[in-house]
A protein has these predicted regions:
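Electron-transfer interface patches adjacent to heme c in soluble/periplasmic c-type cytochromes
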Residues: 92, 113-177, 183-186, 214-225
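Extended intrinsically disordered, low-complexity coil regions enriched in Ser, Thr, Gly, Ala
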Residues: 170-173, 183-207, 241-243, 248
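Bacterial Sec-dependent signal peptides at the C-terminal "C-region" and cleavage site
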Residues: 38-47
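N-terminal secretory signal peptides that target proteins for export/translocation
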Residues: 1-20
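Sequence/structural segment immediately N-terminal to covalent heme-attachment motifs in c-type
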Residues: 77-102, 107-117
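Detector for the c-type heme attachment site
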Residues: 97-103, 179, 213, 233-234
């Protein structure tokens, strides 16, 4: 009798291990479902950098702000012009090569490469020389080893009277240049006889632009190249007149 009473006084769970296992499984399942429900209801938190749209918008606005020359937006996509300005002026330093060199790239005390008395090293605002901005004419010669040394000049990137960039190039031509380096002017062909100071000796290829970093630029996206073209179409025309480099002349009227 006492044994029966003691037996009945023991908790039922101790007498039913299978029931205990079922309760643990049920509890675990309930906890898992609760966690999943909470995770679905909890808003996701964005981490990392801005979205591509945010970054592009920032570049567009900055590009429009730093353009050193007045821009012509007529019949042009202003957003592409802004993005193109950012690439040309803040990333690629196109004017560093496509002007006449450091001595004329900037004006007076606005030249960061020169001392700016009485304050010593440059500490003020840069002032780009708009008279030479992207007008080409930087001499990368002498180039080659023959007696008549060749001088290579950076090309004029400003639009002509048609409003097309780089002296009247179509976008398709401009795209081809940046993708392949093709020289549409073909002003320095390969030498076929005695070097005359204008032709290129092997192994250099007279069909492509030398010095220009098109092997790097060819990896740019179509949209970025289009933006550069749009910007170069919006800047003022410059007629660069340098003896021995008629290719730099531009019909602005």
């Amino acid at each position: 009798m006492n044994n029966r009473l003691k037996l009945h006084s023991i908790p039922a769970l101790l007498l039913k291990p299978k029931s205990l296992s079922k309760m643990w499984v049920a509890s675990a399942a309930f906890f898992t479902i609760a966690v999943l429900l909470v995770s679905f209801k909890t808003p996701s938190v964005k981490a990392g950098p801005q979205t591509d749209n945010d970054l592009n918008e920032s570049k567009i606005q900055l590009g429009l702000a730093i353009a050193p020359v007045p821009l012509n937006f007529e019949h042009r996509n202003k957003r592409l012009v802004g993005l193109g300005s950012y690439i040309v002026n803040a990333q690629a330093d196109c004017n560093g090569c496509h002007s006449r060199g450091p001595s004329t790239e900037y004006l007076g005390p606005g030249n960061p490469y020169l001392l700016s008395p009485p304050h010593g090293p440059f500490g003020g605002m840069q002032e780009v020389n708009i008279a030479t901005y992207l007008g080409g004419g930087r001499d990368f010669g002498p180039f080659g080893s023959h007696s008549e040394l060749l001088h290579l000049y950076s090309r004029n990137l400003t639009p002509d009277k048609t409003g097309r960039a780089a002296g009247g190039l179509t976008y398709e031509q401009f795209l081809t240049i940046l993708r392949t380096g093709k020289d549409y002017d073909h002003i320095h062909p390969n030498c076929t006889g005695t070097p005359d100071g204008n032709c290129l000796l092997p192994p250099f290829n007279g069909d492509v632009l030398q010095v220009m970093p098109w092997p790097v630029q060819q990896h740019m996206s179509d949209n970025d190249i289009r933006a550069i073209y749009e910007y170069l179409s919006a800047i003022p025309c410059i007629d660069t007149n340098i003896a021995g480099a008629p290719v730099l002349r531009n019909n602005c009227n």
